[in-house]
Amino acid sequence: MKLHDLKPTPGSRKDRKRVGRGPGGTDKTAGRGHKGQKSRSGAGKGAFFEGGRSRLIARLPKRGFNNVGTTYEVVKLSQLQDLEDTTFDRDTLEAYRLVRRKNRPVKLLASGEISRAVTVHVDAASAAAIKAVEAAGGRVVLPEVQTQQDDAQKAE
C-alpha cells in the first residue's frame, strides 16, 4: 500500500451541498425560504439584539472611567544591581524579562540600591533614581522632549 492508494472509508465523507445552482432541490431560494430578513445576504441580528427592547448594555448604569494617565513598565534599581550588563536599554530589559509590555513606556524607580556604574536608557525616571545612579558613577539617559517652541526655532 502506498500513499496514493489511501482513500477515505465509503460513507465517511459527505459532499458539500451546492445551493442555488439550477433546478433539483436547493435552486431558486437556496434553502432560505421566500423574502424576509433571513433570506437576504448579510442578514442577521447583532449579537446583543433583543427584539427591539433596550439592550442589556444600555439598561445598566455607566460606571468608572478611562484613566488618561500613563501607565509605566517599572524597573527598580535593585533589579539592575544583580545583572551583569553595564548598559541597559529597552531591548536589554526585555531580554532580561524586566519589561513585558512593548506598548508601555519604561520608568526607572529608586527601589533598592545600586553600587556600580551603569548607563540606563529609559523613557522616565524618578529624581531619586537618577540621583542614586549618578552617585554610583553611572548615568540615566532620558529622551529629549520636543516642544512647540523648539519646533518654531528650528523653522526660523
Curated annotation (Swiss-Prot):
Q: Which Gene3D superfamilies match?
A: 3.100.10.10
Against InterPro entries, the record matches this protein to:
Ribosomal_uL15, Ribosomal_uL15/eL18, Ribosomal_uL15/eL18_sf, Ribosomal_uL15_bac-type, Ribosomal_uL15_CS
One annotated GO molecular function is: structural constituent of ribosome
Question: What are the record keywords, sorted?
Answer: Ribonucleoprotein, Ribosomal protein, RNA-binding, rRNA-binding
Query: Cross-referenced Pfam families, in alphabetical order?
Result: Ribosomal_L27A
A Gene Ontology biological process term: translation
Q: What does this protein do?
A: Binds to the 23S rRNA.
- Protein family (similarity comment): Belongs to the universal ribosomal protein uL15 family.
User: What is this protein's name?
Assistant: Large ribosomal subunit protein uL15
